[in-house]
């Protein structure tokens, strides 16, 4: 019974999320987040937004604004 209720709630949640994120047929990009909408208008913008990343061997962490280019940080970029 509990599993059935959990499955029912999960299906309702997924259905609601599909309707919330679905495109509007008149304005296809109206419901998308701001960053994604900008990337759809200018596809090269997503490539240009990869700024200020630290290369391998540079110091990284919570105090530094820029993240590692590869995404792996353990006090230094790996």
Curated annotation (Swiss-Prot):
The modification Pyrrolidone carboxylic acid is found at residue 52. One of its GO terms (molecular function) is toxin activity. Expressed by the venom duct. It comes from the Eukaryota. One of its GO terms (cellular component) is extracellular region. Pfam families: Conotoxin. Residues 23-51 form a propeptide. It is found in: Secreted. Its main location: secreted. Disulfide bonds join 53-69, 60-73, 68-77. The presence of a 'disulfide through disulfide knot' structurally defines this protein as a knottin. The cysteine framework is VI/VII (C-C-CC-C-C). This is Conotoxin 1. It comes from Conus imperialis (Imperial cone).
């Amino acid at each position: 019974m509990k599993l059935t209720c959990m499955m029912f709630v999960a299906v309702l949640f997924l259905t609601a999320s599909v309707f919330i994120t679905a495109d509007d047929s008149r304005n296809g990009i109206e419901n998308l987040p701001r960053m994604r909408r900008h990337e759809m208008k200018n596809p090269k913008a997503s490539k240009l937004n990869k700024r200020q990343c630290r290369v391998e061997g540079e110091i990284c962490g919570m105090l530094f604004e820029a993240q590692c280019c590869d995404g792996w940080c353990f006090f230094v970029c790996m």
